[in-house]
């Protein structure tokens, strides 16, 4: 009999969002008259901007003609998209990158998981708590950890609690680690890191020969001009950081699927015999072996984001979601809730009232308000007693959900 990967059996219960879906379905079946408003999983609700949709249509039409047909493309992505990314996303920040350092993918969730392929198993990993579950679970799946303890912490991972006391910004590990996961603007807490805070992490990584995995999936939602959009705005970061970006929330690509990874040629690792080796070369080898590239129409649509018309339309949608965030944040504050985030990120992180647990508050909102959010404890032990609401709903639903919650909590 073929043997399974027993590491999967270490995972705690089900993945967070499928578990939420299961509970909501059960409630809806028992209460078919209920109008349930979902502000939980961060899926977008606005349609693709017209300029992006036109590029999509034009690319599909290209596939219908011999002269413009596109088959297998470059595994790393088409140069016309990569050059647009460099010019419009990085050069404006004062960051210079080579085309060889950017890899177009089918989404940052996969990238955050797949990047582990090029790192040795005995690397020590540091992860924030609370955290996007993919960081934690993928390390469990590949066998980097032991079993979880009663808190949900897996042996072999260094957890960095993010609490009210430290402003939900992790503090530097006291021990040496090799891989550090950072996500700013943060999912789930909605917090951001200043240049000074990021400089501490870059300095730590360089001093300890560590690599930072920097998830910048929500950088387009930053409104404060003082907040960095990329880790590479920090001096020295190109020597120690790999950055992940996504079109999912920025341009509404959750159903389209496109992202990118930046692996600077300066980021080096060590072989088993102690020789320095480029992670860029390893990621290129991994990509060309395991990936055939994002589809041609998808990359054409992604490139349209960087046109003047495409970005103007995309920015309108980002502003729409951030207005939702303001409505949620201010509405909950009026109801007496302690709230964080929602200023430079599309997530609102609220403290559950009356000392309720995260799942107790989930059930209260679902059954009494018919509103779905995400229990903070699902993101890690330090998320207990907190709750995440997403600003990605449509305006009418957001206003209605906030009014229901305010009425219930008063």
From Swiss-Prot:
Signal peptide: none annotated. The modification N6-(pyridoxal phosphate)lysine is found at residue 249. The keyword Transcription does not apply. Gene3D superfamilies: Aspartate Aminotransferase, domain 1, Type I PLP-dependent aspartate aminotransferase-like (Major domain). GO terms for molecular function: L,L-diaminopimelate aminotransferase activity; pyridoxal phosphate binding. Pathway: Amino-acid biosynthesis; L-lysine biosynthesis via DAP pathway; LL-2,6-diaminopimelate from (S)-tetrahydrodipicolinate (aminotransferase route): step 1/1. Pyridoxal 5'-phosphate binds at residues 72, 108-109, 132, 187, 218, 246-248, 257, 292. Its EC number is 2.6.1.83. It catalyses: (2S,6S)-2,6-diaminopimelate + 2-oxoglutarate = (S)-2,3,4,5-tetrahydrodipicolinate + L-glutamate + H2O + H(+). It is an enzyme of class 2 (transferase). It holds the Pfam family Aminotran_1_2. InterPro entries: Aminotransferase_I/II_large, DapL/ALD1, PyrdxlP-dep_Trfase, PyrdxlP-dep_Trfase_major, PyrdxlP-dep_Trfase_small. SUPFAM superfamilies: PLP-dependent transferases. Substrate binds at residues 15, 42, 109, 132, 187, 292, 388. GO terms for biological process: lysine biosynthetic process via diaminopimelate. The keyword Transmembrane does not apply. Keywords: Aminotransferase, Pyridoxal phosphate, Transferase. Its cofactor is pyridoxal 5'-phosphate. Involved in the synthesis of meso-diaminopimelate (m-DAP or DL-DAP), required for both lysine and peptidoglycan biosynthesis. Catalyzes the direct conversion of tetrahydrodipicolinate to LL-diaminopimelate. Belongs to the class-I pyridoxal-phosphate-dependent aminotransferase family. LL-diaminopimelate aminotransferase subfamily. Homodimer. This is LL-diaminopimelate aminotransferase. It comes from Pelobacter propionicus (strain DSM 2379 / NBRC 103807 / OttBd1).
